[in-house]
Amino acid sequence: VTLAGKGGEEVSASTSTFEVSFNTPIRTSLSKNYPNPFNPSTTIDYELSNAGMVSLVIYDLKGAVVKTLVQEHQEPNYHHVVWNGLNNSGQSVASGRYLLKMNAPGYTETITMTLLK
């Protein structure tokens, strides 16, 4: 860029540009499910800042797997999944508290969800 100074002399200035994207989260995170308590379904929102293998698995309080919601490679983005209160066999689960564990590259988080019938 060439500019004119006070006396009309040429003054050089450099410019730089940068791009800001609001489409990619800056951090990986798992939000609380909503509604909570829920019946018959609940929504889980999560954000990925990096691509990689992601798993969201629901466990009962004894540690047994109830439902695998996500088990796949995903791109950085804002994601959500709905759990309808069914287990991996398609059967309705009992009322009670359940643990949702999310694993993603460099990130692990567990939240508690309550199903009321």
Where are these regions (language model features)?
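Generic structural signal for well-ordered beta-strand positions
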Residues: 11, 66-67, 93
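C-terminal tail/sorting-segment detector
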Residues: 73, 91-117
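Short, compositionally biased serine/threonine- and acidic-rich segments at solvent-exposed termini, linkers
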Residues: 1-25
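Signal that preferentially marks extracellular ectodomain short beta-strand elements
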Residues: 81-93
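Short beta-strand edge segments in extracellular beta-sheet folds
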Residues: 2-4, 19-21, 72, 112-117
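Beta-strand-rich extracellular modules
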Residues: 2-6, 86, 103-105
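Glycine-centered coil/turn sites that cap beta-strands in beta-rich domains
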Residues: 19-34, 38-60, 68-72, 80-83, ...
